[in-house]
Amino acid sequence: MATIWFLSLLFLCCILLAAFKHKKRRTNQQQPPSPPGFPIIGNLHQLGELPHQSLWSLSKTYGPVMLLKLGSVPTVVVSSSETAKQVLKINDLHCCSRPSLAGAKELSYNYLDIAFSPFDDYWKELRRICVQELFSAKRVHSIQPIKEEEVRKLIVSATESASQKSPVNLSEKFLDLTVSVICKAAFSLDFHTSVLNNDGFDKLIHDAFLFLGSFSASNFFPNGGWIIDWLTGLQRRREKSVKDLDVFYQQMFDLHKQENKQGVEDFVDLLLKLEKEETVLGYGKLTRNHVKAILMNVLLGAINTSAMTMTWAMAELIRNPRVMKKVQSEIRNQMINKSVITLDDIDHLPYLKMVIKETWRLHPPVPLLLPREVMSEFEINGYKIQPKTLLYVNVWAIGRDPDSWKDADMFYPERFMDNNIDAKGQNFELLPFGSGRRICPGMYMGTTMVEFGLANMLYQFDWEVPDGMVVEDIDMEESPGLAVGKKNELLLVPVKYLGH
């Protein structure tokens, strides 16, 4: 009898083991392919200094849908327009939330902002208000006089350099332009003559970007990573950055209380008015911390990204004289006898728009769209994507995908001439602002800033490389971070155009 029981038990164990192996094999077949990793850290070591480039290289081996283990966090990366469409459009509702990220949590006052807040009724109501009030076409047009004034200042500065035949640091000038416009639009303050004009403000923005884009162990090891962040001093530096930002916000609020302002309502005016009206957002009323979190999105989302795009565009143009000549001819032939190009003029400059789209294709300001968190199971190319998985869309890789773009490494704006591809999130080959429910709400504001600034610099000046250099010396190396700009500053010599 004992023998029968033993044999029966052994037989049952064999059946269970076979079933387990079959289930495991089936599960593995349903998961996306994965590069091999190490225990504990998984694939973290494969990200490198520029993760979008490293992930692009891995996708050439493992395909456009990859599963990685970043520490203890399962992460899926998609790298083609077709898989991006499945994520951002077809299955958007399954994966439009945000993960918990240490830096984002603190900078957004526990996810009270638009960019990093999880998907819920609060986020939907906040986004609706911001789209209607802060980032509407009406609001963008209302700050056009600010842009025109700041561009005139930039033209004066570049004209002085042209008279001396000295180089202009365009990386610095474009950043200064966007900072000046945003500071006036948000705070009604002149960056050059106000309390903002000091290294402290620049450091505030730089540090905030740094903490959002730098490695934080808490993000990859939720149960114990905070210890590493504490030991390395990251947590202390992050807390100081948030405290400094808090002081800055309060300073802006105090200035608005003191002033009896007239004219265009700025962003702080609007947000403080919504706070005073006790505007309801999902589960509660809009508070001062909500206002601070939204201002953080405005500062970080608008300043660096627009400046980076203008810098990349000028770098590509100086390296491609044919394109430079063609876009300048279009602008100058269209804008005869005008001192400054206006926003209305931009609609008559189709080739300029192609140049900007081509710049976004090769140099998207945020090459890995902000991570999404999967809320419910869905499939990409037959692979099952599980809840709580992090999901990245590599728009940098998509812009270089030979299946979507002929001669993908070439800067060739004419590729947009015979198609209707735009950057508004419906064409998944070109996604500088993302797509779906999480598309950048400030897309129109950012686009007009780039178009306006770039058009005027190309209209007013011809551009040359400094003495002792040739165009091939202009490098295209990238700087690491959440938003990826040109690693080395772009210095060019302006030559005043006298034909207008």
From Swiss-Prot:
The chain crosses the membrane at residues 1-21. GO terms for cellular component: membrane. It is a single-pass membrane protein. Its cofactor is heme. Keywords: Heme, Iron, Membrane, Metal-binding, Monooxygenase, Oxidoreductase, Transmembrane, Transmembrane helix. Its EC number is 1.14.-.-. Heme binds at residue 440. The keyword rRNA-binding does not apply. It is an enzyme of class 1 (oxidoreductase). PANTHER family: CYTOCHROME P450 71A9-LIKE ISOFORM X1, CYTOCHROME P450 FAMILY 71 PROTEIN. This is Cytochrome P450 71B9. It comes from Arabidopsis thaliana. The gene is CYP71B9.
